[in-house]
């Protein structure tokens, strides 16, 4: 068994809620250990959605390659199965070149599915089911469809925001197509042994008020950087940019564009939605096995992360 473990590639992950400094720490660790970053963010995969997804600026990368960023158009679908396949290819290439793959992001389902080696069976959606569900969504509304999901698959519903119509429909589609809950599929698709030797570093602020202040400040900075123009682009293409149109950072401004709410109210709504999202991220990562939590407010947080990574790599 020890020999098998030694053959596994080491993979580092930096996780945690939004606005905790994951990007900067990922870059620092990549500089210290000849690493390359794989973005584990479900929205940074899309081109043109830069401000609202808090993509790393070129000057902030310090020359470190960042993968799984800006590779799809906003109207192209991208699933967790797609991410696991893409990240697997990227990891193999990075490791083959003698560099350290560093997963950085806050999409917990992506991180966990990749590190745990979840296998996704190809399932055929019955003809007309997707169209039927979309029609039901239009007729009954998001709240009714979410309540249906809560009955059919409570665990999936708990992990999906009620306003995320795309994911609600996907979960219902899976249930109606297979008669099984997503959680059942996940349990059946876990391999007996994880494919990578991993260290998962989690960033959080012990003072929740400090995290919320950082989130509010980040929203203000995003607005200064052109978030409203980006949100208007998504609004204008909302029929085709369906995933982006459900994303936090864009949909909150739709009432402003429709003339039904002032900008200040929409901005406050975004701040509240971001705070709620941070809570859900924390809940997800707190339930993941083996996360080593670091105080993001500590002056020596980077030094501590470097030390832990050095010890982790030495064990390989």
Which sequence ranges carry the predicted segments?
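Phosphate/pyrophosphate-binding catalytic cores of soluble transferases and nucleic-acid-acting enzymes
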Residues: 1-316
């Amino acid at each position: 068994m020890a020999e098998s473990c030694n053959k596994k590639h080491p993979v580092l992950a930096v996780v945690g809620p939004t606005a905790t400094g994951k990007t900067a720490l990922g870059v620092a660790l990549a500089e210290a250990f000849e690493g390359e970053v794989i973005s584990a963010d479900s929205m940074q995969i899309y081109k043109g959605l830069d401000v609202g997804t808090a993509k790393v600026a070129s000057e902030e990368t310090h020359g470190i390659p960042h993968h799984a960023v800006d590779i799809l158009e906003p109207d192209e679908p991208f699933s967790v199965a797609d991410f696991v396949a893409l990240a697997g290819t990227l990891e193999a290439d990075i490791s083959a070149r003698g560099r350290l793959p560093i997963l950085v992001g806050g999409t917990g389902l992506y991180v966990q599915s990749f590190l745990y080696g979840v296998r996704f069976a190809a399932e055929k959606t019955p003809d007309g089911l997707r169209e039927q569900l979309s029609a039901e969504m239009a007729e009954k509304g998001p709240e009714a469809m979410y309540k249906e999901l809560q009955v059919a698959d409570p665990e999936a519903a708990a992990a999906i925001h009620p306003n995320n119509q795309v994911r609600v429909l996907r979960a219902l589609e899976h249930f109606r197509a297979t008669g099984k809950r997503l959680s059942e599929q996940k349990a059946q698709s876990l391999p007996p042994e994880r494919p990578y030797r991993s260290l998962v570093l989690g960033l959080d602020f012990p003072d929740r008020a400090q995290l919320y202040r950082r989130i509010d400040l980040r929203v203000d900075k995003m607005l200064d950087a052109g978030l409203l123009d980006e949100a208007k682009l998504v609004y204008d293409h909302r029929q085709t940019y369906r995933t982006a149109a459900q994303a936090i950072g864009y949909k909150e401004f739709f009432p402003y564009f429709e003339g039904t709410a002032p900008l200040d109210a929409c901005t406050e709504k975004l701040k509240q939605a971001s705070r709620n999202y941070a809570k859900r991220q924390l809940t997800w990562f707190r339930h993941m096995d083996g996360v080593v939590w670091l105080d993001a407010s500590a002056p020596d947080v980077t030094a501590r992360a470097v030390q832990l990574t050095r010890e982790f790599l030495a064990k390989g």
